[in-house]
């Protein structure tokens, strides 16, 4: 028996209109993403590297004046024929439009690393820059990179980038791209970012459309290069930003695969906060007669403009102490660093319930949510950012008044970079407040050294921690993988 409106096939009853092409039940064709054929590696083109014309005022500097400038700024240079430092934007040879833009952004003069780094980079030499976080190093390589790219032959169809900047994290990649985009239009150049954790299709499309400047994480760049979407033979200006961090994260094999694929006569710039043996080895392998500038020293050092407060306490006291600290900074931008994603989410709930505008940022967040969180933080809609190590380096937000280490990081190097999110560039002093527990004792001695070197107060409890055994301060559970509320978990975890 056939029922009205139904078909009688062996598959059972179903609406007879199911096959109607206009029916909402009809299968919908899926739109396939546009596919791009691999780009061939084209023959290299001639290029130039030296764009520096020393200003007359710089040429007149006496050796004693040069030495005095470097000594005043705690600067050491190494290598032969290192250019003299500049002290005004105009002396770098940038266009009036670039200089005006720098002034409009609130910069009155180059920072120490820019004053020495710009002449070195613009002269076409391979160079290494060692500088503390917040010193203005991003502009130290971005503006010379744009000058370099602008004065090369135009990109041909299928060419890869002229400038390649490698960075350890997608957050740092996006931050560098933001700085690049502020100046790209003045040079009539295009840039794109290549990083993991997001769809590769828009990145592939941007590479095929052509971009003179590419900022990338090593892993995603290798993937796209191997697929034929990111040829590197046109790269004549290579930057390794936070080289020490990239090696710490295990990117050395990727770096050693990427670098030989660029132009053999390229200019290479390496930037790092420290100068360990591994970074030196990488420089010796791929740089020719490089010159070096060190601002401060090659050892781990904190920014002298940051007032550092270290408070020894137990894990269970942290939450109440955090509220007490935040009460004194209402309305100010504050970054709270934690070691675990779960701690970030817990604190986000606690602080918002208490009336604070807080948002969490960690590795489980999608890129869209991360962008929204950072936009809300920058605008002040949510003035408290709670983050894991994912935001510890490269995050450049204006007017961060306070950095709180709710959890002490796994190393003092990460501590330096965390607190460096405040007092950046030529801005005034910032403050860091760190909660330190017995579980962090392994870092106590190095932390004391850095505090004393920066003329900061060393709490007596911290000194005692170095002298006595762990048993005097806490139970075994406090010293192992438990979070601040005593729950078992992996510690420290950097999301």
UniProtKB/Swiss-Prot annotation:
Positions of short motif Q motif: 87-115
Primary location class: cytoplasm
Region Disordered: start-end pairs: 1-38
Reaction(s) catalysed by this chain's protein: ATP + H2O = ADP + phosphate + H(+)
Record: residues binding ATP: 131-138
Protein species of origin: Encephalitozoon cuniculi (strain GB-M1)
Listed Pfam families: DEAD, Helicase_C
UniProt xrefs under Gene3D superfamilies: P-loop containing nucleotide triphosphate hydrolases (3.40.50.300)
Keyword Cytoplasm among record annotations: yes
E.C. no: 3.6.4.13
Domain Helicase ATP-binding positions: 118-293
UniProt remark on domains: The Q motif is unique to and characteristic of the DEAD box family of RNA helicases and controls ATP binding and hydrolysis.
Family per record: Belongs to the DEAD box helicase family. DDX5/DBP2 subfamily.
Basic and acidic residues bias: start-end ranges: 1-35
Subunit text: Associates with polysomes.
Family annotation (InterPro entries): DEAD/DEAH_box_helicase_dom, Helicase_ATP-bd, Helicase_C-like, P-loop_NTPase, RNA-helicase_DEAD-box_CS, RNA_helicase_DEAD_Q_motif
Location(s) in or outside the cell: Cytoplasm; Nucleus
Entry GO MF terms: ATP binding; ATP hydrolysis activity; RNA binding; RNA helicase activity
Gene Ontology annotations of biological process type: nuclear-transcribed mRNA catabolic process, nonsense-mediated decay; rRNA processing
A single Gene Ontology CC term: nucleus
Protein's UniProt name: ATP-dependent RNA helicase DBP2
Keyword ATP-binding: yes
